[in-house]
Design a protein with these regions (language model features):
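A penicillin-recognizing enzyme superfamily signal
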Residues: 44, 97-206
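Active/ligand-binding-proximal structured segments within catalytic/core domains
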Residues: 1-3
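Mid-domain, small-residue-enriched loop/turn segments at the edges of structured enzyme/sensor domains
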Residues: 28-33, 62-103
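Surface-exposed patches in mature extracellular/periplasmic domains of secreted proteins
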Residues: 14, 78-89, 115-119, 150-155
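Conserved catalytic neighborhood of penicillin-recognizing serine enzymes
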Residues: 7-66, 110, 114, 124-145
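Glycine- and acidic
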Residues: 51-52, 85-89, 193-197
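Structural recognition of the beta-strand scaffold that forms the well-ordered cores
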Residues: 16, 44, 56-58, 68-69, ...
Length: 206
């Protein structure tokens, strides 16, 4: 989403977004921490996974267009029966697989080109441009500068772009790390989708 907003010229890395109670029609998202931070930069909003700024950006980009961009890159969104992409999409309103998520995040290390994961080395490589090379560079720099989610200020020799997530109801905790050579995704959850209270992407999957 942030890369698409960068490509559209809607924001740059230090543009200010408002993290405060807002209504988007009849939708009023809150943050995971149940608090708000006021004006925040795009970089901070992305690093901290702030919900309200993300919904604001999705409203400007358009949820249907955003979903189409993801599907074109191999992320086959699973929506509730009869539902069309809406603003809840960016907060877990649609599902995907870990493999598809990793393929999309690989674009950050591949100049904006997503690659469908292959299970066999001789399988054909399927690539799709998801974002511009410039947007991929900026988003990767933002996620690298945030550090590892559970220890954001620890020094490390490896530059890793980290992103984590926790689904509504604690059904899924996930993390993706991107380097020049590897893109690794981790999912923690139960096959039947029952909750794991206290399981967060940053402290469980990362």
């Amino acid at each position: 989403l942030y890369a698409l907003a960068l490509d559209d010229g809607l924001v740059h890395s230090e543009s200010l977004l408002v993290d405060a109670p807002q209504n988007f029609g009849d939708y009023a998202p809150g943050n995971f921490q149940a608090s708000f931070n006021g004006p925040v930069s795009v970089s901070e909003a992305l690093q901290r996974s702030l919900n309200v700024p993300a919904v604001d950006l999705l409203e400007r980009v358009g949820p249907v267009r955003f979903a189409a961009q993801l599907r074109n890159a191999g992320v086959k969104l699973r929506m509730p029966q009869g539902a069309t992409p809406n603003l809840s999409l960016i907060l877990g309103g649609g599902g995907t697989t870990l493999e598809e998520l990793v393929g999309a995040y690989a674009a950050l290390a591949r100049g904006g080109v997503a690659a469908h994961p292959r299970l066999m080395p001789d399988a054909p490589l399927v690539e799709t441009r998801l974002m511009s090379a410039g947007a991929a560079f900026i988003v990767r720099e933002i996620l690298e500068s945030g550090g590892r989610p559970d220890t954001p200020f620890r020094e490390t020799s490896a530059r890793v772009a980290w992103k984590t997530g926790t689904s509504f109801g604690f059904r899924d905790a996930w993390a993706v790390g991107v380097t020049d050579r590897y893109t690794v995704g981790i999912w923690v959850g139960r096959p039947d989708g029952t909750p794991n209270p206290g399981f967060f992407g940053a402290n469980t999957a990362a």
